[in-house]
């Protein structure tokens, strides 16, 4: 497995990966999400590759106060082999190198498997409520 920064040639394969991982939602246009990411800290958009095929991804961010991770996904055929841990670990190292003191991760409330994975990596559930507001309406995907 190789973990590397996303490249433009990965575009379609990453979207297909996200479909396999059930990460896409009708209100998010994955193509726009990738384009936006490529304009802001593209070196924090990582993919895991095995034999030339992309099998995992994570999209990280850092605003100078806290880091974030989105679109963490590993193809179902490659789960349970440490790919997600490796992607998060690499993102953590990149964020630490920038002086980032904390990484916040959003997980759907009913995603027990992913919550358990993060807990094994010493992440803790926070007593906060996340609020959101759509500022730009993407086309439905």
Curated annotation (Swiss-Prot):
Q: Keyword check for Transferase, yes or no.
A: yes
UniProt-listed Pfam families: Acetyltransf_1
Entry annotated with the keyword Transferase: yes
Entry superkingdom? Bacteria
The molecular function terms in GO held by this entry are: acyltransferase activity, transferring groups other than amino-acyl groups
> Could you tell me the EC number(s) of this protein?
2.3.1.-
Supply the alphabetized keyword list: Acyltransferase, Transferase
NCBIfam families attached to this UniProt entry: PRK03624.1
Give the UniProt family note.
Belongs to the acetyltransferase family. YpeA subfamily.
Identification of the protein by name: Acetyltransferase YE1169
- Native species of this protein? Yersinia enterocolitica serotype O:8 / biotype 1B (strain NCTC 13174 / 8081)
